Amino acid sequence: MFRVAIVGIPNVGKSSLFNRIIGQRKAIVEDIPGVTRDRIVSTAEWRGVKFEVVDTGGYITGDEDKFAPYIRKQVEKELELSDLFIFVVDGKQGLTPLDKEIANILHRTEKPVIVAVNKIDDPEKEKLAYEFYELGFENIIPISAIQKLGLAELLDKVVEYIPEYEKEIQEEEEKEEKRDYIKVAIVGKPNAGKSSLINALLNEERVLVSEIPGTTRDTVDILYEKDGQKFLFLDTAGMRKKSKVDFGLEFFSVGRTIEAIEKADVVVLVIDANQGATEQDTKIAGLIQRRYKPAVIVINKIDTVDKKTLEKVEKQVRERLYFISYAPIVFTSAKTKEGLDELLEKIVYVYNQAWKRVGTGQLNRAIKQIQNLRQPPTYQGKPLKIYYATQLEGKPPAFLLFVNKAEGFKENYVKFLENNLRKLLGLENAPIKLIFRGKEEEKDK
């Protein structure tokens, strides 16, 4: 989501403006410099467009306040995270040297800045805003956070900067939020038993089933409800090896399988217990992994193999599909209906895990714990460092890690981080995405 940070020196009215924008009194407002010591993040909406808004502590240069270094650090983090800055200045007090210092910092970010000249509670005082053009920013807007003057113009300008694709994503997400079902893509090799599985769930011959590979040529969407939970099953035709795919119906079935994976909330990969995980299953699992999709692996047709064989198949599937180790395995038989209830339970479970939010404190404690187990390696002769991490909006769980050298974090250590984060954060069955953002090494302290 587009992120807007409110910055400025202490006691210029940042928290009052923040409270006006979000429509509730969330930040503490007092006439004491530096009252807001932590960043407060909330979601705001203007003219139907949503964005994140952050109230930062007042920027202080010296250390006369014991919290000054902490506040500076919080503000500096927002310089990286935010997409736009509302720079609040005091119209009554006028331009200060500290305002100029903050302006220089904001110019270096090369991100859009709107200067909100606060405490202009009378239209006749708007001329007091003119001197702030000296800061070198194009957008100077006189406002009064207390009296709500100029706020519409300010927020109109904020929304102008939000990219169209962000607005389109919000519209799609709003549509998604209104639906009350989980979209499930049933994928796998032809004749692995996908359609039979759905028919067994539905107790009816809803999907065409035969012994001929690839009988189901199209993607068939089926809405199903169990114990008050709705599922929309996207039954696909199955993916075949490229050598066997001719242009025409088979070619488009592969494309539709990929499309179903992209649309799905949860992907169910169906594997034939008689064959185990094949090369083609591995490729389908790769599609699931690259799209960070929550998944359940189904070993189907268990009525056709003995227990010892099934144990070997499970081991082989885990070894071959190691890169989606987060996906739980369910054993099913469409013929005897064994494992069907467990399959539905796992679909709901992994779906909920994909939506899980983790507190910033909990996340950073987990990362510290992981580093105590195994420190990041060195890169170009210097140790790699993880400074701070935060969870991004949306699903699946995605974490932004601020590090000294992003390019130094290679697959081996990244996998180590991922696996341990899953354990420590209760995300064992969720795909997680780690994004590394590098910054210059801090000066020797």
Swiss-Prot record:
Molecular function in Gene Ontology: GTP binding; ribosome binding
Subunit structure of this chain's protein: Associates with the 50S ribosomal subunit.
Residues binding GTP 2, per UniProt: 188-195, 235-239, 300-303
Assigned protein family: Belongs to the TRAFAC class TrmE-Era-EngA-EngB-Septin-like GTPase superfamily. EngA (Der) GTPase family.
SUPFAM superfamilies for this protein: P-loop containing nucleoside triphosphate hydrolases
Keywords noted in UniProt: GTP-binding, Nucleotide-binding, Repeat, Ribosome biogenesis
Function: GTPase that plays an essential role in the late steps of ribosome biogenesis.
Protein known as: GTPase Der
InterPro entries xref list: G_ENGA (IPR031166), GTP-bd (IPR006073), GTPase_Der (IPR016484), KH_dom-like (IPR032859), KH_dom-like_a/b (IPR015946), P-loop_NTPase (IPR027417), Small_GTP-bd (IPR005225)
The species this protein was found in: Sulfurihydrogenibium sp. (strain YO3AOP1)
One example of a Gene Ontology biological process annotation: ribosome biogenesis
Record domain EngA-type G: where: 2-166, 182-355
Highest taxon above the source species: Bacteria
Every KH-like domain range: 356-440
Annotated binding of GTP 1, by residue: 8-15, 55-59, 118-121
